[in-house]
From Swiss-Prot:
GN (gene name): mnmE
Domain TrmE-type G, first and last residues per copy: 227-386
Binding-site positions, K(+): 237, 256, 258, 261
Free-text remark on how the cofactor is bound: Binds 1 potassium ion per subunit.
Binding positions (Mg(2+)): 241, 262
Listed SUPFAM superfamilies: P-loop containing nucleoside triphosphate hydrolases, TrmE connector domain
One Pfam family cited in the UniProt record for this chain: MnmE_helical
Protein name: tRNA modification GTPase MnmE
Taxonomy of the source species: Bacteria, Bacillati, Cyanobacteriota, Cyanophyceae, Synechococcales
Keywords on record: Cytoplasm, GTP-binding, Hydrolase, Magnesium, Metal-binding, Nucleotide-binding, Potassium, tRNA processing
Annotated source species: Synechococcus sp. (strain CC9311)
EC number: 3.6.-.-
Length: 463
């Protein structure tokens, strides 16, 4: 896909680095478009005989209107079309970090004719429109920026390196080969040897199965990319806060022997085997007249409803109680739950019957104090949430890509049914064309600008 949209006659500008008040040694202001070089040249004083050539770094100052007052000392990096990220003239102004100087420089840039503030993701969108990136690579940039774990970053890099695009091109070409065979038979059947319908059908089935495998991997990748919300639930003083501290490796919760110490919803961000996890340590749910504790319990119920997984802790030493069963009944239908028997290091105090019930109920046994059973819990969490698989996860489609892959697979299934029904060749081609179109949409070969606008609106400004 390439071409210039009506708004690409204007240059765009934005701060391309995250700037926090008083922080950051260097900030980068990026411009792209036909006016980029002229706009920066108009607001800078570049001493000596420095030449505005592509892929050169110039030293100078950004000056206020009037050309006298210096606003900042800067480096200017020039990248002329087509050898730039967007395929247009790109200029970066590297100025001092912070807030005031950066905003002053950006304001001067935006004062120049033909320059406007960039929309979220617009630099990447122009790269796609100008044929510098396919859509899967552009989306991978957003995934890399937002990666919350090393594993998520690795999956993003696989997409940025073209893994998804190359896979889709190969699958699409295989379908195009079959379509050309079918269409040739429709138009020139009497001049060609008989078509091997069985071989063609096997090829369609093979592509469909590959697409479904990619969709399944995409579901695993979604867990890695977006993470999980895991709620820790249990009676007061069963060890929820101790487990939170064990998994997060720091004292996030107040741990005492006083039941009901946690009265608020505590959150801890951790990474388990490459999967970002938000642990929600809830207040113990019980009947109470304390107004503060009631608020914490209400938040606990909300956490149950929003969680991807619930860890229901109970005291192995005390056994599975009626209160534990009542808590189990509060977990919303459809929310996965692991019943975790804690305090496995303590001597049993329960009656033999309660002890037997506890042993049979527990999905995982551990001691949050000693750490015994921690790895078994981690594996159980990842398995229950679909983050584990038989094969290593090398590529992961995002939701948009997965939806289109499903559409393509469904179209191929219909094509296979048409073949099974013995209908003529031209009926085979209808759904086959739909599958080919869907794969083209994944890489951006067949997309409207309105769809691109929606995709890139999720990006941060400056990317």
């Amino acid at each position: 896909m390439s071409g210039i949209g009506p708004d690409q006659a204007l240059s765009i500008a934005a701060i391309a680095t995250a700037v926090a008040p008083g922080q950051g040694g260097i900030a980068v202001i990026r411009l792209s478009g036909p006016s980029a070089v002229r706009a920066v040249a108009a607001i800078t004083v570049i001493p000596g005989q420095q030449v505005w050539e592509s892929h050169r770094v110039l030293y100078g100052h950004v000056v206020a209107a009037g050309g006298v007052e210096r606003l900042d000392e800067v480096l200017v990096l020039v990248m002329l079309a087509p050898r730039s990220f967007t395929g247009e003239d790109v200029v970066e102004i590297h100025c001092h970090g912070g807030v005031i100087a950066v905003q002053q420089v950006l304001a001067r840039v935006l004062e120049q004719p033909g320059v406007r503030r960039a929309l979220p993701g617009e630099f990447s969108q122009r790269a796609v429109l100008n044929g510098r990136l396919d859509l899967t690579r552009a989306e991978a940039i957003g995934d890399l920026v937002g990666a919350r774990s090393q594993r998520a970053a690795q999956l993003a890099m696989a997409g940025l390196d073209g893994g998804i695009q190359k896979k889709m091109v190969v699958l699409r070409e295989r379908l195009l080969d079959q379509l050309s065979e079918l269409e040739a038979r429709v138009d020139f059947e009497e001049d060609l040897p008989p078509l091997n319908g069985e071989a063609l059908l096997q090829e369609l089935q093979a592509v469909r199965l590959e697409l479904l495998t990619l969709v399944a991997d995409g579901e695993r990748g979604s867990v890695v990319r977006h993470g999980l919300r895991v709620a820790l639930v249990g009676r007061p003083n069963v060890g929820k806060s101790s487990l939170l501290n064990l998994l997060s490796r720091r004292e996030r919760a107040i741990v005492t022997d006083l039941p009901g110490t946690t009265r608020d919803l505590l959150e801890s961000e951790i990474v388990l085997d490459g999967v970002p996890i938000t642990l929600l340590d809830t207040a113990g749910i019980r009947a109470t007249s304390n107004a503060v504790e009631k608020l914490g319990i209400a938040r606990s119920r909300d956490a149950l409803a929003s969680a991807d997984l619930v860890l229901l802790l109970f005291d192995l030493a005390q056994g599975w109680s009626d209160d534990d069963q009542a808590l189990f009944a509060l977990i919303p239908e459809g929310v996965p739950c692991l019943r975790v028997g804690n305090k496995a290091d303590l001597p049993l105090k329960a009656e033999p019957v309660a002890e037997t019930v506890a042993a049979s109920v527990a999905d995982v046994r551990l001691s949050a104090v000693t750490g015994d059973g921690e790895q078994a819990l981690v594996q159980a969490v990842l398995e229950r949430c679909g983050a584990l698989g038989e094969q290593p996860l090398l590529l992961a489609l995002n939701q948009r890509q997965s939806d289109l892959a499903v559409t393509a697979a469904e179209a191929l299934a219909r094509s296979e049914q048409v073949a099974a029904d013995g209908l003529p060749w031209d009926f085979w081609t209808i759904d086959l064309r739909q599958a080919i179109r869907s794969l083209g949409e994944i890489t951006g070969e067949q997309l409207t600008e309105s769809v691109l606008d929606r995709i890139f609106s999720r990006f941060c400004i400056g990317k």
